[in-house]
A protein has these predicted regions:
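A glycine-rich, Thr/Ser-enriched phosphate-binding loop motif common to dinucleotide/cofactor-binding enzymes
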Residues: 1-14
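Glycine-rich adenosine-cofactor-binding loop
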Residues: 10, 17-43, 48-59
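Short glycine/serine- and small hydrophobic-enriched flexible loop segments
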Residues: 11-16, 328-332
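Residue-level recognition of the N-termini of beta-strands and the immediately preceding loop/turn
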Residues: 21-22, 47-50, 111, 159-161, ...
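NAD(P)-binding Rossmann-fold cofactor-contacting core
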Residues: 42-111
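Rossmann-like adenosine-cofactor binding region
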Residues: 91-95, 105-219
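Adenosine-phosphate binding glycine-rich loop
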Residues: 169-346
Length: 346
């Protein structure tokens, strides 16, 4: 469940991205499996290339068999994207052998497996990362998985990417080079850049500010402060708050117009003059509020632009609360489907 809930959090931002054509995944364990599976379930039709990078080719082979043939894996996985595997349900469920299980179907992009043992690994790694639109780092590597310069030089910065680093969980381990984080939090200057680059957000998105500042190797070694990281939950609340303000603003305009009509009909001349002054003051105050809200809306649009198209880095160290939430939902689903056994007063 830990790998599943970690991938759920990572893909919250991934599913909103404008471009997810080229997905790169480092690793071939449970974390990699769930990140790939959820990515395909959420945006599979938009993913054109899936590149899996791992030291052991056989582990990637096993991951793909489990992914595309969950009931009975074939002896040899066919990497041809035109090949559509069939699935078998458990015996006794009334389905004919070989009939495709629609509940297990996953879109099939073009899949490439890359291992460091390949003779042209450096060149292929460079090309794969440069073309990537999303990178999931799902290993326990103590050192960066690739040189920072691939993404930090002018050519590497042209394309906006979503990077999720979820494997390293100690201050001394870094899957992602700290220089990439430093560049991502660097302030944007008002003047035009000689080299065009994707929007930087000025912050790294994390699951927990306190824990990442102490435990996440990438964050610690990049020397980031509290003002340079933002919790993913806060981004969700900002969106909800912006939506609420817009609704309140529209409701306020309606109430103001209604008040003017009532005052004009029911009040005497003297009271009307007093009311007009109040309404003028109210309108002036409303205009100030509107200007304030316009500024907030621009900031909100800029935030959305960054999250959807810019360079976004998400770092996770794991939260126990997510285990409780996901576990509760799994129990609820099991109850609804009458699966498993409940032990009362356990």
């Amino acid at each position: 469940m830990t790998a599943f809930r970690t991938a759920l959090a990572s893909t919250m931002l991934f599913k909103k991205r404008a471009n997810v054509h080229d997905v790169v995944v480092f690793g071939a364990g449970k974390q990699a499996y769930w990140h790939i599976r959820l990515a395909l379930l959420l945006r599979g039709d938009d993913i054109h290339h899936l590149n899996i990078i791992n030291r052991d080719f056989e582990r990637v082979h096993q991951l793909l068999e489990k992914l595309y043939n969950p009931h009975e894996a074939p002896s040899n996985f066919n990497p041809d994207p035109s090949y559509v595997p069939t699935y078998r349900q458990a015996a006794g469920e009334g389905e004919k052998e070989g009939q495709q299980d629609q509940h297990q179907y996953l879109p099939r992009p073009k899949i490439q497996i890359l291992t460091p043992g390949h003779g042209e690994y450096p060149r292929l790694l460079h090309a794969t990362l440069r073309s990537s639109s999303c990178i999931f780092l799902c290993t326990q590597s103590p050192t960066p998985l690739f040189p920072a310069v691939i993404l930090t030089n002018p050519e590497g910065r042209k394309k906006g990417r979503y990077i999720a680093a979820i494997g390293s969980l100690s201050p001394h381990s870094t899957e992602l080079h700290p220089d990439i984080l430093k560049q991502n939090v660097a302030p944007e200057h008002g003047h035009r850049h000689f080299h065009k680059h994707a929007q930087q957000g000025g912050a790294v998105v994390v699951d927990s500010v306190d824990r990442c500042l102490k435990e996440a190797g990438e964050v610690v070694q990049a020397g980031l402060g509290p003002e340079q990281v933002v919790e993913i939950g806060e981004l969700v609340m900002l969106k909800r708050d912006a939506d609420r303000r817009r609704k309140e603003c529209m409701a306020g305009k309606g109430m103001e117009a209604e008040g003017l009509d009532v005052g004009g009909v029911e009040l005497g001349e003297c009271e009307m003059n007093k009311n007009e002054k109040k309404n003028k003051a109210r309108r002036g105050s409303s205009k100030e509020k509107e200007k304030h809200h316009e500024g907030e809306d621009k900031a909100h649009k800029s935030l959305i632009e960054w999250l959807v198209k810019g360079n976004v880095i998400y770092k996770s160290v794991g939260l126990g609360l997510t285990d409780v939430v996901v576990g509760g939902d799994l129990v609820r689903i099991a109850d609804e489907r009458n699966i498993g056994m409940r032990i009362e007063n356990f």
